[in-house]
Design a protein with these regions (language model features):
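Eukaryotic scaffold repeat domains enriched in small/polar residues
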Residues: 1-142
């Protein structure tokens, strides 16, 4: 079978459908909304399945999962320079700052309490985060 290649020129990428090697009974049964990669080349697949965060090594081997009961509708992942994760949940209207093993360090927003649309109060379907070089956090909201 001919591999699927996307892109052009120096930016060509080959699709590897079977790259993720999940344990028996585990599967991505919902959207993988975002991915991030830490300094050790571990891949964080933030998904809308039963195990919201699936951690894989660079070869796709399953390492662990976490976030069950914490996340409602995962949306964005940002790996910070200090190897922590900023995770947005647009269904729960929160941003969570977590360690790489899932310990929640900080929650921004009130879980399950959306603010009025366009009110400017955190949050109404927050989507992504970005950190400035001075460590200012920016959040896109819905």
């Amino acid at each position: 079978m001919t591999p699927v290649v996307l892109g052009a020129g120096a930016y060509r990428y080959e699709v590897h459908d079977a790259w993720a090697k999940l344990p028996p009974g585990r599967e991505f049964n919902a959207d993988v909304a975002a991915v991030g990669v830490d300094a050790q080349d571990r891949v964080y697949a933030f998904n809308r399945g039963r195990h919201p965060m699936v951690v894989l090594d660079r070869d796709g081997t399953f390492l662990r999962s976490w976030g069950e009961g914490v996340f409602h509708r995962p949306h964005g992942v940002h790996v910070a320079p200090d190897d922590t994760l900023w995770l947005t949940d647009d269904g729960d209207h929160t941003v969570r700052h977590c360690t790489l093993d899932g310990k929640v360090l900080l929650t921004l927003g009130i879980p399950g309490s959306p603010k009025p649309y366009m009110s400017g109060e955190p949050f109404h379907r927050c989507t992504h985060t970005a950190l400035s070089p001075r460590d200012d956090l920016y959040v896109s909201d819905g």
